[in-house]
């Protein structure tokens, strides 16, 4: 069905198409037509960060920034949904145009800039969501005008506001579209920031009587030495999990494309190799007690399998949905299922 809808959608500019897609999704969900338009996703129970997931394929942050489409998105078959990024105060983001579709390359360049209605609006929306078919992650960031020296105040404020409603919280330190944000991944800065957030997490756990996992979302553009340094900090601070990765400011395989010079983060198929290398290196340098989510460039089931092979416990997709539609979710689940079955069969044959 999506293959019939996509050509019409792609006649619109990318951001308008994004808005139309979400409105159409809501209409289909509330009218009861959504099951007729999507394939049933078979369960593949998975455990990570101490949470139970109906399947290991989730939606990455960025599609539903304000938590206004949670019910409809879960109905697409995702094992978990991550909403945001949200910030303490509302902000408009960067000037338009700020979202560019590279159709032939199955890629997107965005410089949205954390446009959102603020964490208080998101909290109200989450509280009003009726269906939770799997864990809900909430991705938090800092406001554009908050200096890095005060970034922990923004993150702690958001963490306190969302803690009671989130199944896990992602600390977004890696968007390339907020000036200076990625500097927070520098080893000493990262150690100080995560230390403060871990203290807040422990205080909130005691207050609410439950531990909400805290994940760190990393950039794909780090050098090997920077990845290793970050891994040391993440291990020392005993974070619950890591998401690898965010979008890239490099332009792999796109040098001749007319949009390659547009500022912003690149996602989609060209990011697959780079993000998977970072994932694999993090897996090598982190203990198995720290689960990883693989994201970046997943456009088919084989891509999801590659993330799992590189050490991911879960995967997320977003840009691939733009080009493949909701069927990508089930395709990824089945690819991961086949990989697990083949691995299990191989172990049995060697015993």
Curated annotation (Swiss-Prot):
InterPro entries per the UniProt record, alphabetical: Aldolase_TIM, DHO_dehydrogenase, Dihydroorotate_DH_1_2, Dihydroorotate_DH_2, Dihydroorotate_DH_cat, Dihydroorotate_DH_CS
Binding site for FMN: 61-65, 85, 139, 172, 217, 245, 268, 297, 318-319
Principal location listed in the UniProt entry: membrane
Residues the record marks as active site: 175 (nucleophile)
Function per UniProt: Catalyzes the conversion of dihydroorotate to orotate with quinone as electron acceptor.
Reaction equations catalysed: (S)-dihydroorotate + a quinone = orotate + a quinol
Family per record: Belongs to the dihydroorotate dehydrogenase family. Type 2 subfamily.
Protein's name in the database: Dihydroorotate dehydrogenase (quinone)
Keyword hit for Cell division: no
Gene: pyrD
GO biological process: 'de novo' pyrimidine nucleobase biosynthetic process; 'de novo' UMP biosynthetic process
């Amino acid at each position: 069905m999506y293959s019939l809808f996509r050509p019409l959608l792609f006649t619109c500019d990318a951001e308008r198409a994004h808005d139309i897609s979400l409105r159409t999704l809501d209409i289909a969900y509330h009218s009861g037509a959504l099951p007729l338009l999507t394939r049933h996703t078979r369960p593949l129970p998975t455990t990570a960060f101490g949470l139970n997931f109906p399947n290991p394929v989730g939606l990455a942050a960025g599609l539903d920034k304000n938590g206004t489409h949670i019910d409809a998105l879960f109905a697409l078959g995702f094992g978990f949904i991550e909403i945001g990024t949200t910030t303490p105060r509302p902000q408009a983001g960067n000037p338009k145009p700020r979202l560019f579709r590279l159709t032939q390359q199955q890629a997107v360049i965005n410089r949205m800039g954390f446009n959102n209605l603020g964490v208080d609006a998101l909290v109200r929306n989450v509280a009003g969501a009726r269906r939770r078919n799997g864990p809900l992650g909430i991705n938090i960031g800092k406001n554009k005008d908050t200096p890095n020296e005060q970034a922990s105040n923004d993150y702690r404020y958001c963490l306190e506001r969302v803690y009671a409603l989130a199944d896990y919280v992602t600390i977004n330190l890696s968007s390339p579209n907020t000036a200076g944000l990625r500097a927070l991944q520098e080893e000493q800065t990262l150690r100080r920031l995560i230390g403060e957030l871990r203290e807040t997490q422990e205080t909130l756990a005691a207050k609410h009587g439950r531990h909400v996992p805290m994940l760190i979302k990393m950039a794909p553009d780090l050098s090997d030495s920077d990845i290793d340094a970050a891994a040391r900090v993440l291990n020392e601070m005993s974070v619950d999990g890591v998401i690898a990765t965010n979008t890239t400011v490099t332009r792999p395989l796109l040098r001749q494309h007319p949009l390659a010079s547009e500022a912003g983060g690149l996602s989609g198929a060209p990011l697959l190799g780079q993000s998977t290398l970072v994932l694999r290196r993090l897996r090598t340098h982190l203990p198995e007690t720290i689960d990883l989510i693989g994201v970046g460039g997943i456009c088919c089931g084989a891509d999801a399998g590659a993330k799992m092979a590189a050490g991911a416990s879960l995967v997320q997709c977003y840009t691939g949905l733009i080009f493949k539609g909701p069927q990508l979710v089930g395709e990824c689940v089945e690819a991961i299922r086949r990989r697990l079955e083949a691995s299990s069969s191989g172990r049995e044959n060697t015993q």
